């Protein structure tokens, strides 16, 4: 009973949130490099600037200096007993603009060195190819994934990575949280598909168009990986938040179903190799006609090997009188679930919802799964003696790991591993803050760019080490 013997315990980061060194080693400018810092206290959102502008605050330029500290950090991960470490390969370290003929050797070597360091300690790298780090030149000069040329650029990048690291990396994912763009905002469109909205653009159409191109690119990458090395396992990565009806009222139940349809059709394409009927009917109603016969063939031949997903919270939705036939949701339909507590950022804490999500995937696809992000962001306080008592993080993770364990023991879920977010404090992707901390490892740096990037252990460090030692039996 319990977790499999080879369960992949570990942690997850993204290159743009931790590496820094934004102009070192031949790296080009990514879309994340032109996103400013935000502020949870004032409510100021991140802004997208037209290139790098002097005087603006771009936290991703420095991250937590993982580029220079990775050996120290991997040693700390090993001390906790990590079996896996998930990160991404920054596309612009390999192809600085995205359209070069040959890859950048300095960038390739950095990841060679990082993966070698992981293997030195018996840590399995788990790699995302595109984690909000698309080339800025792809956005500015090609229109991002609204342009079919982006498919070829991504597949070329993926093939270079598969060929170079095929004997160092077994587990891969294509596009991180590809379904975030279901909420059609400029922030989500630039992070997912390097799409810059112009005056007169139909944003919803562009979301579906660029997502389709990403799904085709993903399927081609899956097929290429299997041709390069049949042992490679390529998954999708879905941002998963179960959606509950706010009440038993039938309209609320249908609205929750509509939200699940709208937010999670992407995984249907990844896992089944074709679009679900409800999305095809939507395209028919709206006159969207961009799926070619060749695309259908590619999608059918490029199904993923496993489902990777993030889980932080659940949502509740209430029918507001809109879309009485389609029950398409809008973000304003989401309401507070009064049965749940929330973090300082308003993220509702629902460990049982994680078990619900595992079952939702399992019932539909019967594929292996990997939870590649789950964690608790908080304002951590470092005491005068250097300690950080983050019992709240331990409590959050303990309840979520128990939910995973129950899904395995009672529901028959095939769970490969859990790489929690994130083992070390990093820049928040949503708000661009340092002070939203997730790690077992405290990084001495803050929103005001004060600190020396020194690392120290929080209370949760030793707790997680014990969890791994006992394969989740002792929480």
Predicted regions, residues:
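Active-site region of glycoside hydrolase catalytic domains
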Residues: 1-54, 97-99, 108-475
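Active-site mouth loops of central-metabolism enzymes
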Residues: 55-69, 146-149
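Short, flexible active-site loop motifs that bind/organize anionic cofactors or intermediates
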Residues: 60, 67, 98-101, 344
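Internal amphipathic alpha-helical repeat/solenoid segments
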Residues: 63-75, 96, 107
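Catalytic domains of carbohydrate-active enzymes, especially glycoside hydrolases
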Residues: 69-90, 301-307
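A short acidic, glycine/proline-enriched capping/turn motif at secondary-structure boundaries
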Residues: 83, 92-94, 132-134
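Glycine-rich, proline-tolerant flexible connector loops at the mouths of alpha/beta enzymes
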Residues: 89-103
